[in-house]
Amino acid sequence: MIEDTDFEIFLYISKNKYQIFVFDKNYLKNLYNEEIKNIDEIELNTLSKFLDENIYKIEKMIKNFIRDIILIIEDDKVLDVGISLKKNNYDKDINQKYIKNTLVEIKDVFRENYQDQIIMHMIVVDNDNKNDDYLFLEVNFISITNNFTFYFDKLLESHQIMISRYMSGKYIKSYIGEDLAEISIMANKLNNGSNKNEVQLVSKNVKNTGFFEKFFQLFS
């Protein structure tokens, strides 16, 4: 039996194909990789059959149940929004706590203005605007609407599987191009903080004392 801490399951969804991976976190390679082509649309019946076939095969292979999955979505419904904030720095001391609090403010601005969106990625844009009098931060948010993800949540719930995270296929492919065999490898790296400018978000239900699981090293 393969322990569920030894692997990650990625499900890639686009209008052109569905693809499911079992990624070995110890050996950093795919143990399983299956796909099915689409005809320019996301069709839930086809996806349901694809999951029925492959979840059974995967659980038989790993001799364990799939409890959660990382969903990679590539679709024109994925939103990419930039928000910037400039704050006076009266103490003349910009430390990580100050930056963290500012990022929480920016995140709250996004939440207030895009209440129907799930944040997939929160990325701090590099800038050379260093000034002791103020802090300027520009952040890109990549998100997806709740209405779009609702059907995937319900579909996987029928298999007793929870979606642990949503990721953007376009964002991942910006690092690897169109080679989808590598998408699970890059998704694993990004999920573990390989982009030091990406803020790693965690649910408050997981940690009561922290909005950030890892803090990027942009200002260190």
Regions found by a protein language model. Give the residues of each.
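Conserved blade-register residue in beta-propeller folds
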Residues: 20-22
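Eukaryote-biased detector of low-complexity, proline/serine/threonine-rich segments
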Residues: 66-68
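Nucleotide/phosphate-binding catalytic cleft detector across ATP-hydrolyzing
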Residues: 1-13, 25-31, 35-64, 73-220
